[in-house]
């Protein structure tokens, strides 16, 4: 009976790790899609500044389809991983040996933390993509209004020139923001690639921690320091973003 329940637990862990690996790859691709959309936005904005082309950016229909497809796939993987975590929680609640149950709860918490990180990363990347797309739609509408105004009868050239200069100023501000987003995306991708290597190391350290309490205490201190460093890094990125925004709009 014990062997059967142990096999069930290992099977759940195997499913969780497999889904986590799939999500990691999907999120990297999803992030690259958002980054490429942002870069193309800056390039196409410069080329179309004085044109009357109102075609959506980067063949928007295909770009949107790709975005929607990837978002659905990631949401499905997150739902499946949530289900596996729920089954693992049910198993830990039914485990009868206290020492074994504590070790299982530690492992379950680690998988829950990974799920929470992936969910947060997905929603953040999705929100960035939607913001860029909405801004491009707005700028496309502005360009169309400018061209309509220029082509109309009795156009006031001076007013049109001021309008175009203001539009250029907005475009330059957008470019600064997009560069900041690109830097943040590159940093996130680098951290994502390092996370894969740290996973295996962390798993081995957890195994040692379950056997040696002193190692467990050391791991907890390492985790606290890692969270502190993450908060510091996030604060620095936030301050840099605010400074760039202040510089762009003044």
Curated annotation (Swiss-Prot):
Broad class of where this protein is predominantly found: Golgi
Record's keyword terms, sorted: Acetylation, Coiled coil, ER-Golgi transport, Golgi apparatus, Membrane, Phosphoprotein, Protein transport, Transmembrane, Transmembrane helix, Transport
Coiled-coil region(s): 9-30, 68-95
Region (Disordered): 38-59
GO CC term, one of those recorded: Golgi trans cisterna
Residues bearing the modification Phosphoserine: 141
Compartments, record wording: Golgi apparatus membrane
Superkingdom of the organism of origin: Eukaryota
Membrane topology: Single-pass type IV membrane protein
TM stretches of this protein: 230-250
Biological process, per Gene Ontology: endoplasmic reticulum to Golgi vesicle-mediated transport; inter-Golgi cisterna vesicle-mediated transport; intra-Golgi vesicle-mediated transport; protein transport; vesicle fusion
Cytoplasmic topology ranges: 2-229
Span of the signal peptide: none
A molecular function (GO) term: SNAP receptor activity
N-acetylalanine carried by residues: 2
Biased amino acid composition, Basic and acidic residues: 41-51
Protein family: Belongs to the GOSR1 family.
Record text on subunit structure and interactions: Component of several multiprotein Golgi SNARE complexes. Identified in a SNARE complex with BET1, STX5 and YKT6, in a SNARE complex with BET1L, STX5 and YKT6, in a SNARE complex with STX5, GOSR2, SEC22B and BET1, and in complex with STX5 and COG3. Interacts with GABARAPL2.
PANTHER family per UniProt: GOLGI SNAP RECEPTOR COMPLEX MEMBER 1, GOS-28 SNARE- RELATED
The protein's name in its UniProt record: Golgi SNAP receptor complex member 1
Organism listed in the record: Cricetulus griseus (Chinese hamster)
Gene name per UniProt: GOSR1
